[in-house]
Amino acid sequence: MFEGVIPALITPFNDDASQSLDIEGLRNCIEYVIRGGVHGLLACGSTGESATMTHAEHIRVIEETVSAASNRIPAIAGTGSNNTEEALLMTRAAKMSGADGVLLISPYYNKPNRSGLLKHYRKVADIGLPVIVYNIPGRTGQNLPADLIIEMVETIPNLVAVKEASGNLDQMMAIIQGTQDLDREYPFILTSGDDSLTLPVLSVGGHGCISVTANIEPKRLVEMYDLFRRSDVKAAMKKHYELMDLSKALFMEVNPVPVKRAAEIRGLINSGNVRLPLDSLGEQNTAILRGVLSRYD
């Protein structure tokens, strides 16, 4: 269900005093990536600035994403929290909104123990939506090791995928090895959470990416994925390296600061602003980003 190229959508904000949601801009971004051939949508992840949205805004963005997807491709909602009750609240809201699945970042800051993590994921999974575990230790302060992911997969039937952003290929291979022969209704999916590792992850048995770069160059990323799936590895590798400069530029500052400015430069949204405590991309880095983007026109 969640294989292929899935953009981690930005959440555009207006330039008014409250930085209100730019729903028209969100819809425009969604149509752009769908025209680019992506295989799904993720709303309200790290790239979508879920951390600085109210619950009402968070739910509105999920609803708008589900509506805009219009059953053409799956719509996934980021509903994770370091507070299990909040994760339950947002996951129930996602289910009510018609989301096809949820992405649950591992609880950050409070560093739960193993049994706490297992109980957290089981409790949220009991709501009934397909669950994608999100492992990003650089943001959460805690890695989810391969043996823990495998135990989750063995004991939570609707835990269907992991977004792996640890940067550790050995760990990813261990997850793939440990889950590929399990007796499940659907094969367990491992998707890359690092754009620079999408092709390497595919090459060791991964299934796609949840991508920042796909907000800006969905077509090229989908072409790379399709070439790999057709076993044209040399052509896929060429596409991969073509995208490297852009992928690096989109992380010249903390995500999603550069990608929102890139979307503004491309005319997808009116403003690339972000909410505090993040700050928008400055003039010098904006000029660098423009130069990189010009090579993809």
Swiss-Prot record:
GO BP: diaminopimelate biosynthetic process; lysine biosynthetic process via diaminopimelate
Keywords: Amino-acid biosynthesis, Cytoplasm, Diaminopimelate biosynthesis, Lyase, Lysine biosynthesis, Schiff base
Positions with a binding annotation for pyruvate: 47, 210
UniProt catalytic activity: L-aspartate 4-semialdehyde + pyruvate = (2S,4S)-4-hydroxy-2,3,4,5-tetrahydrodipicolinate + H2O + H(+)
Gene Ontology molecular function: any one: 2-dehydro-3-deoxy-phosphogluconate aldolase activity
InterPro entries membership: Aldolase_TIM, DapA, DapA-like, Schiff_base-form_aldolases_AS, Schiff_base-form_aldolases_CS
Transmembrane segments: none
Active site: 134 (proton donor/acceptor), 163 (schiff-base intermediate with substrate)
Protein localization: Cytoplasm
CDD domains cross-referenced by the UniProt entry: DHDPS
Site (Part of a proton relay during catalysis): 46, 109
Keyword Cytoplasm: yes
EC number: 4.3.3.7
Keyword Cytoplasm found: yes
Function: Catalyzes the condensation of (S)-aspartate-beta-semialdehyde [(S)-ASA] and pyruvate to 4-hydroxy-tetrahydrodipicolinate (HTPA).
Name the record gives this protein: 4-hydroxy-tetrahydrodipicolinate synthase
Taxonomic source organism: Methanocorpusculum labreanum (strain ATCC 43576 / DSM 4855 / Z)
The gene coding this protein: dapA
